[in-house]
Amino acid sequence: MTETGDDLATVKKPIPFLVIFKDLRHVFSRDTTGREILGIAFPAALALAADPIASLIDTAFVGRLGAVQLAAVGVSIAIFNQASRITIFPLVSLTTSFVAEEDTMEKMKEEANKANLVHAETILVQDSLEKGISSPTSNDTNQPQQPPAPDTKSNSGNKSNKKEKRTIRTASTAMILGLILGLVQAIFLIFSSKLLLGVMGVKPNSPMLSPAHKYLSIRALGAPALLLSLAMQGIFRGFKDTKTPLFATVVADVINIVLDPIFIFVLRLGIIGAAIAHVISQYFMTLILFVFLAKKVNLIPPNFGDLQFGRFLKNGLLLLARTIAVTFCQTLAAAMAARLGTTPMAAFQICLQVWLTSSLLNDGLAVAGQAILACSFAEKDYNKVTAVASRVLQMGFVLGLGLSVFVGLGLYFGAGVFSKDPAVIHLMAIGIPFIAATQPINSLAFVLDGVNFGASDFAYTAYSMVGVAAISIAAVIYMAKTNGFIGIWIALTIYMALRAITGIARMATGTGPWRFLRGRSSSSSS
């Protein structure tokens, strides 16, 4: 008894934190895990990068109209994007996880039903054979008993079932919510555009007011298409399909680029033409995604009561709080930089945009991690969960190291591309060490968002982000007052470091959805 007790006492307990380094030497391996991650991440990253590129071209066309029109479009887009960001992030994140989970569960049910059906047919055939062989009253004992002929109709039915549309309740729910949120956003922006422009500093007598009001009001008409298309992108991500959204995004951006000069210059609609071109492209993207999705999914659920509005609302409010916390930290940092003067603000804005560029690349890994992990958690395939989670984090960190070198050298030698002002360039040089050195931290923080969303750990991510924001807000205010421009970047470094630490805490401690990391060795002894 004593020896057995000693043996049990000496069993090594697993250390959850070490799972992060699982198969580290295979981080660049093109194995099944690596191919699956990159197959989702690469198209997702391209789709995310396509919009900013199209926006730059769009801005170039508007810039030819004059400085007033360009400024009007800039402030209008800032308002539109800020209003959209609040709803887009929760909607897309929840849709991806929920659809991946439900789709996986439905596939598991289908496989179980098929297995049960095959088992029942096998028993029936065996029973028929036994009866045929053992029956003494058989009319023709010389002829061997043949098993029942296969049902060709059944086989053809099975082939058609493979192409049968799926009923995914969360997909239908997400689309309805996307349309409703888009309509609400459109109405809000149309009727409050002048008020919002005033809040952004556009005065009643400003020459920007009229063109900005017209542009924002027309762009608002595209909000329903934008939110609905993003809901459908979340659905495709849940199916682990990021190529279809990439195709739709590229087509829409090309349409926008082609229509811009036609509406702006040929039809002489000016800034209004730019807005119309963008709205048309949004509706084209929605139509493309809708057509592809209609081939896969029954968009109208059999029963309205099957829709999961409550689940979306509960978790959506949590992610809304998280989004507000993230936005507030970055907005406060910009506000503190603005208080330092025009030159520090200009340098800060350039540095901030470069600092956050890594999110476009890492969001691709985050999307891949979220989709695969949501499926794996639904299957309770914890070996795959650990393999995928560790791999995307390792890939994110390596990508961050590469970005650190690229961004550091790029800003050092290419600062003149962003500004010709020596004072601005000098302040940018001060910020370069922070921007470059924090790229691996940023990468981990962004990828961890996808990992935690894949685990459906929405409550933790929301509450932890609010806590991070509270500390970071205090740090931004204090450091900006005491250390000026450098202080703001120190505070932002603290902010991203806290995001990464809290993001990895659940996995590293084996808590929440990651409890299985601690209980793996104990299962054998129980």
Swiss-Prot record:
Q: Which domain of life is it from?
A: Eukaryota
Specify where it is mainly localized: membrane
Q: Which Pfam families is this protein grouped with?
A: MatE
| Localization, UniProt | Cell membrane
Q: Which UniProt keywords apply?
A: Cell membrane, Ion channel, Ion transport, Membrane, Transmembrane, Transmembrane helix, Transport
All ranges on the Extracellular side of the membrane = 58-59, 192-215, 268-270, 338-353, 418-426, 479-484
Where would you find the membrane-spanning parts of this chain?
37-57, 60-80, 171-191, 216-236, 245-267, 271-293, 317-337, 354-374, 397-417, 427-447, 458-478, 485-505
Upon gene disruption, the observed phenotype is: Chlorotic. Constitutive expression of strategy I iron deficiency response and accumulation of iron, manganese and zinc in shoots. No reduction in aluminum tolerance. Accumulation of Mn, Cu, Zn and Mg in leaves and accumulation of Fe in roots. Altered pollen development.
Q: Name one GO cellular component term.
A: plasma membrane
Bias kind Polar residues: ranges: 134-144
Residues in the Cytoplasmic compartment per record? 1-36, 81-170, 237-244, 294-316, 375-396, 448-457, 506-526
Q: Does the keyword Cell division apply?
A: no
What induces this one? Two-fold induction by iron deficiency. Not induced by aluminum. Induced by abscisic acid (ABA).
**GO MF annotation, one:** metal ion transmembrane transporter activity
Membrane topology designation: Multi-pass membrane protein
Q: In which tissues is it expressed?
A: Expressed in roots in the pericycle and cells internal to the pericycle and surrounding the vascular tissue. Also expressed in seed and flower.
Question: Is this entry keyworded Cell membrane?
Answer: yes
Family note: Belongs to the multi antimicrobial extrusion (MATE) (TC 2.A.66.1) family.
Entry function: Citrate transporter responsible for loading citrate into xylem tissues, which helps facilitate iron transport to shoots. Mediates the citrate release in the apoplastic spaces during plant development allowing iron nutrition between symplastically disconnected tissues.
Fetch the NCBIfam families from UniProt: matE (TIGR00797)
The record, for PANTHER family, names:
PROTEIN DETOXIFICATION 43, PROTEIN DETOXIFICATION 44, CHLOROPLASTIC-RELATED
| Record's protein name | Protein DETOXIFICATION 43
Which species is the source of this protein?
Arabidopsis thaliana (Mouse-ear cress)
Tell me the name of the encoding gene.
Answer: DTX43
